[in-house]
Amino acid sequence: MKNDNAYFVHETAIIDDEAIIGDHTKIWHFSHIQSGATIGENCSLGQNVNVGNNVKIGNSVKIQNNVSVYEGVELEDFVFCGPSMVFTNILLPRCEFPQRGSKFYSKTLVKKSASIGANATIVCGNTIGQYALIGAGSVIIKDVPDYALMVGNPGLQVGWVNKKGIQISFDDQGLSPCGNYKLENEMVSYLGKE
Protein backbone atom coordinates (compact mmCIF):
# COMPACT_ATOMS: atom_id res chain seq x y z
CA MET A 1 0.00 0.00 0.00
CA LYS A 2 1.44 3.35 -1.04
CA ASN A 3 0.42 6.38 0.98
CA ASP A 4 0.78 10.14 0.98
CA ASN A 5 3.78 10.01 3.31
CA ALA A 6 6.12 8.44 0.70
CA TYR A 7 6.70 5.15 2.48
CA PHE A 8 5.56 1.66 1.43
CA VAL A 9 3.43 -0.64 3.57
CA HIS A 10 2.41 -4.09 2.30
CA GLU A 11 -1.36 -4.64 2.44
CA THR A 12 -0.98 -7.35 5.12
CA ALA A 13 1.05 -5.13 7.48
CA ILE A 14 -0.58 -3.24 10.35
CA ILE A 15 0.43 0.30 11.30
CA ASP A 16 -1.15 1.52 14.55
CA ASP A 17 -2.26 5.10 15.05
CA GLU A 18 0.44 7.41 16.36
CA ALA A 19 3.26 5.40 14.78
CA ILE A 20 5.67 7.62 12.85
CA ILE A 21 7.32 6.25 9.71
CA GLY A 22 9.97 8.10 7.70
CA ASP A 23 9.99 8.63 3.96
CA HIS A 24 11.18 5.84 1.65
CA THR A 25 10.84 3.19 4.37
CA LYS A 26 9.44 -0.20 3.31
CA ILE A 27 7.38 -2.42 5.61
CA TRP A 28 6.68 -5.91 4.29
CA HIS A 29 4.21 -8.79 4.77
CA PHE A 30 2.54 -9.40 8.14
CA SER A 31 4.57 -6.80 10.03
CA HIS A 32 3.08 -4.76 12.89
CA ILE A 33 4.21 -1.28 13.92
CA GLN A 34 2.70 -0.41 17.30
CA SER A 35 1.50 2.92 18.64
CA GLY A 36 4.18 5.45 19.48
CA ALA A 37 6.92 3.68 17.49
CA THR A 38 9.19 5.94 15.45
CA ILE A 39 10.92 4.56 12.36
CA GLY A 40 13.36 6.72 10.41
CA GLU A 41 13.81 7.23 6.69
CA ASN A 42 15.05 4.63 4.18
CA CYS A 43 14.49 1.65 6.48
CA SER A 44 13.54 -1.86 5.39
CA LEU A 45 11.47 -4.11 7.66
CA GLY A 46 11.10 -7.67 6.37
CA GLN A 47 8.22 -10.09 6.79
CA ASN A 48 6.71 -10.66 10.24
CA VAL A 49 8.58 -7.84 11.98
CA ASN A 50 7.02 -6.46 15.15
CA VAL A 51 8.02 -3.00 16.39
CA GLY A 52 6.77 -2.38 19.93
CA ASN A 53 5.23 0.67 21.53
CA ASN A 54 7.53 3.70 21.79
CA VAL A 55 10.48 1.99 20.06
CA LYS A 56 12.91 4.32 18.27
CA ILE A 57 14.52 3.16 15.03
CA GLY A 58 16.97 5.43 13.21
CA ASN A 59 17.50 6.01 9.50
CA SER A 60 18.62 3.36 6.98
CA VAL A 61 18.05 0.46 9.39
CA LYS A 62 17.48 -3.02 7.94
CA ILE A 63 15.48 -5.52 9.98
CA GLN A 64 15.23 -8.96 8.41
CA ASN A 65 12.29 -11.40 8.69
CA ASN A 66 10.87 -12.62 12.02
CA VAL A 67 12.37 -10.00 14.35
CA SER A 68 10.55 -8.35 17.27
CA VAL A 69 11.91 -5.03 18.48
CA TYR A 70 10.27 -4.65 21.88
CA GLU A 71 9.63 -1.53 23.92
CA GLY A 72 12.86 -0.46 25.60
CA VAL A 73 15.01 -1.15 22.52
CA GLU A 74 16.55 1.66 20.47
CA LEU A 75 18.30 1.17 17.12
CA GLU A 76 20.49 4.00 15.84
CA ASP A 77 21.15 4.72 12.13
CA PHE A 78 22.39 1.96 9.77
CA VAL A 79 21.83 -0.93 12.20
CA PHE A 80 21.38 -4.39 10.64
CA CYS A 81 19.25 -7.04 12.40
CA GLY A 82 19.61 -10.50 10.85
CA PRO A 83 16.74 -12.95 10.36
CA SER A 84 15.08 -14.30 13.51
CA MET A 85 17.45 -12.54 15.91
CA VAL A 86 15.93 -11.79 19.32
CA PHE A 87 15.76 -8.77 21.62
CA THR A 88 14.52 -9.21 25.19
CA ASN A 89 13.23 -6.38 27.36
CA ILE A 90 12.60 -7.93 30.80
CA LEU A 91 15.36 -9.65 32.78
CA LEU A 92 13.14 -11.84 34.97
CA PRO A 93 9.88 -12.57 33.13
CA ARG A 94 7.11 -14.32 35.07
CA CYS A 95 3.60 -15.13 33.84
CA GLU A 96 2.21 -15.22 37.37
CA PHE A 97 3.57 -11.73 38.12
CA PRO A 98 3.10 -9.67 34.94
CA GLN A 99 5.61 -6.91 34.36
CA ARG A 100 3.83 -4.68 31.91
CA GLY A 101 4.82 -1.13 31.32
CA SER A 102 8.07 0.69 30.71
CA LYS A 103 9.06 0.82 34.41
CA PHE A 104 9.89 -2.91 34.17
CA TYR A 105 11.84 -2.76 30.91
CA SER A 106 15.63 -2.79 30.82
CA LYS A 107 16.83 -0.55 28.00
CA THR A 108 18.90 -1.87 25.11
CA LEU A 109 20.78 0.47 22.78
CA VAL A 110 22.24 -0.66 19.47
CA LYS A 111 24.58 2.06 18.25
CA LYS A 112 25.22 3.32 14.74
CA SER A 113 26.10 0.75 12.07
CA ALA A 114 26.24 -2.27 14.38
CA SER A 115 25.28 -5.59 12.77
CA ILE A 116 23.56 -8.48 14.53
CA GLY A 117 23.65 -11.90 12.84
CA ALA A 118 20.81 -14.35 12.29
CA ASN A 119 19.37 -16.04 15.39
CA ALA A 120 21.51 -13.99 17.80
CA THR A 121 19.96 -13.00 21.14
CA ILE A 122 20.55 -9.63 22.79
CA VAL A 123 19.70 -9.83 26.49
CA CYS A 124 18.18 -6.55 27.66
CA GLY A 125 20.03 -3.87 29.58
CA ASN A 126 23.07 -3.83 27.30
CA THR A 127 24.60 -1.50 24.74
CA ILE A 128 25.98 -2.75 21.44
CA GLY A 129 28.75 -0.38 20.33
CA GLN A 130 28.94 1.32 16.98
CA TYR A 131 30.18 -0.85 14.09
CA ALA A 132 30.21 -3.93 16.36
CA LEU A 133 29.54 -7.25 14.64
CA ILE A 134 27.55 -9.91 16.50
CA GLY A 135 27.97 -13.37 14.94
CA ALA A 136 25.01 -15.55 14.02
CA GLY A 137 23.58 -17.45 16.98
CA SER A 138 25.53 -15.48 19.60
CA VAL A 139 23.97 -14.65 22.97
CA ILE A 140 25.00 -11.22 24.23
CA ILE A 141 24.76 -10.78 28.01
CA LYS A 142 26.97 -7.70 28.52
CA ASP A 143 27.89 -4.43 26.84
CA VAL A 144 29.80 -4.73 23.57
CA PRO A 145 32.56 -2.20 22.71
CA ASP A 146 32.64 -0.23 19.46
CA TYR A 147 34.11 -2.29 16.57
CA ALA A 148 34.07 -5.55 18.60
CA LEU A 149 33.59 -8.95 16.95
CA MET A 150 31.45 -11.16 19.21
CA VAL A 151 30.63 -14.86 18.79
CA GLY A 152 29.30 -17.76 20.85
CA ASN A 153 27.07 -18.46 23.84
CA PRO A 154 27.72 -16.54 25.95
CA GLY A 155 29.06 -14.02 23.46
CA LEU A 156 32.81 -13.58 23.69
CA GLN A 157 34.91 -10.99 21.96
CA VAL A 158 37.24 -12.70 19.48
CA GLY A 159 38.59 -9.65 17.69
CA TRP A 160 37.88 -6.31 16.11
CA VAL A 161 36.29 -5.24 12.81
CA ASN A 162 36.53 -2.08 10.72
CA LYS A 163 33.61 0.02 9.51
CA LYS A 164 33.04 -2.44 6.65
CA GLY A 165 32.85 -5.42 9.04
CA ILE A 166 36.24 -6.84 8.01
CA GLN A 167 38.36 -8.25 10.85
CA ILE A 168 41.41 -6.12 11.68
CA SER A 169 44.54 -6.59 13.78
CA PHE A 170 46.84 -4.17 15.56
CA ASP A 171 50.63 -3.84 15.89
CA ASP A 172 52.60 -3.24 19.11
CA GLN A 173 51.77 0.48 18.95
CA GLY A 174 48.06 -0.28 18.64
CA LEU A 175 47.73 0.74 14.98
CA SER A 176 45.90 -1.31 12.36
CA PRO A 177 47.93 -2.24 9.23
CA CYS A 178 45.88 0.22 7.16
CA GLY A 179 46.56 3.00 9.68
CA ASN A 180 42.88 3.89 10.00
CA TYR A 181 42.25 2.47 13.48
CA LYS A 182 43.95 2.65 16.86
CA LEU A 183 43.55 0.24 19.77
CA GLU A 184 44.19 1.83 23.15
CA ASN A 185 42.96 0.66 26.58
CA GLU A 186 40.83 -2.04 24.91
CA MET A 187 38.96 0.58 22.87
CA VAL A 188 39.19 1.09 19.13
CA SER A 189 39.05 4.57 17.66
CA TYR A 190 38.73 5.52 14.01
CA LEU A 191 41.46 7.90 12.85
CA GLY A 192 39.42 9.29 9.97
CA LYS A 193 41.68 8.25 7.11
CA GLU A 194 39.30 6.09 5.00
Which residues fall in each region the model found?
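Short cysteine-rich clusters marking metal-coordination/redox-active sites
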Residues: 162, 176-178
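Conserved beta-strand-loop-alpha-helix hinge in the C-terminal portion
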Residues: 147-166
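Short Cys/His-rich "knuckle" micro-motifs
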Residues: 170-174, 184-187
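P-loop NTP-binding/switch modules centered on Walker-like glycine-rich loops
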Residues: 112-113, 130-131, 141
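Short metal-binding segments enriched for Cys and/or His
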Residues: 182-194
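Flexible, glycine/small-residue-enriched loop-and-beta-strand segment within the central core
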Residues: 3-5, 11, 16-21, 26-127
